[in-house]
Curated annotation (Swiss-Prot):
GO terms for biological process: DNA repair; organic phosphonate catabolic process. InterPro entries: HAD-like_hydrolase_sf, HAD-like_sf, HAD-SF_hydro_IA, HAD_sf, PGP-like_dom2, Phosphonoacetald_hydro. Belongs to the HAD-like hydrolase superfamily. PhnX family. Involved in phosphonate degradation. This is Phosphonoacetaldehyde hydrolase. The gene is phnX. Binds 1 Mg(2+) ion per subunit. It comes from Salmonella paratyphi A (strain AKU_12601). Keywords: Hydrolase, Magnesium, Metal-binding, Schiff base. One of its GO terms (molecular function) is magnesium ion binding. It is an enzyme of class 3 (hydrolase).
Length: 269
């Protein structure tokens, strides 16, 4: 059948952890713990979607963070420094990720709708396996259990923005064509991952990292503030090449219906 056979879903900010707060807060704590260097939550969000070692490396290259680092140590951040921050990050993230394992509103119903249509549920994450081994069973306890998952350090080729985690899902799920897959993510590296894998891509503008609000804050936010944040997030996701941008995973079934119509007309990603 010339239709969508699988979706490949990100985790934090896409299916669990509205606003993607688990990783961002831990980066701030890890920099402070390892080197007594302060970074802001906004800075911690900038490279979101990359593997966590690569995320720390990218943070060290942000001009403001690099300036603070140079002022304190008289040199740029080194690979050994990144290793030290990562060593601080990992136990903090492993300990706290279960506190951010609840599915985002609409996720459970959306997964049920997709499965009723015969669509398989793949997933991948910028989290390493040690973190995913805590997160996956915790999310399952809340009712979210994808058919497959891949961690950022599982594959020798690497993680995002490369296509490998998405393609590993294709193999594991037995999907016959990447054009029959949709990659869904709330951050630009995950959109690039899907494009590099030859898939349709859907960005999430409200539930994730770029919007950057807790569920409670979002619920009490003015329509004007929501619109401004949504536009900011959507512009970044479209700039990354997303075929579609919607608010959250709850909007995905409608997008898939649209993609199926395009596939039936012979279109490809």
């Amino acid at each position: 059948m010339n239709r969508i056979h699988a979706v490949i879903l990100d985790w934090a900010g896409t299916t669990v952890d509205f606003g993607s707060f688990a990783p961002t807060q831990i980066f701030v704590e890890a920099f402070r713990q390892a080197f007594d260097v302060e970074i802001t939550l906004a800075e911690a969000r900038v490279p979101m979607g990359l593997g966590k070692w690569q995320h720390i490396e990218a943070l060290g290259k942000l001009p403001a963070v690099d300036a603070r680092w140079q002022a304190k140590f008289g040199r740029a951040m080194s690979a050994a420094d990144i290793d030290a921050i990562y060593a601080a990050f990992m136990p903090l993230q492993i300990a706290k990720v279960v506190d951010f394992s609840s599915p985002i509103a609409g996720v459970i119903d959306t997964i049920a709708t997709l499965r009723a249509e015969g669509i398989k549920i793949g997933s991948c994450s910028g989290y390493p396996r040690a973190v995913m081994e805590r997160l996956v069973p915790a999310a399952a306890g809340h009712g979210y259990c994808p058919d497959h998952w891949v961690a950022t350090d599982d594959l020798a080729a690497g993680g995002r923005p490369g296509p490998w985690m998405a393609l590993q899902n294709v193999i594991a799920l037995g999907i016959d064509a990447v054009a029959h897959c949709v990659k869904v993510d709330d951050a630009a590296p995950g959109i690039s991952e899907g494009l590099n894998a030859g898939m349709w891509t859907v960005g999430l503008a409200v539930s994730g990292n770029e919007f950057g609000a807790t569920w409670d804050a979002y619920q009490t936010m003015s329509k004007e503030d929501v619109a401004v944040r949504r536009e900011h997030a959507a512009s970044k996701l479209y700039a990354a090449g997303a075929h579609y941008v919607v608010d959250s995973l709850a909007d995905l079934p409608g997008v898939i219906a649209h993609i199926n119509a395009r596939l039936a007309q012979g279109e490809r990603p």
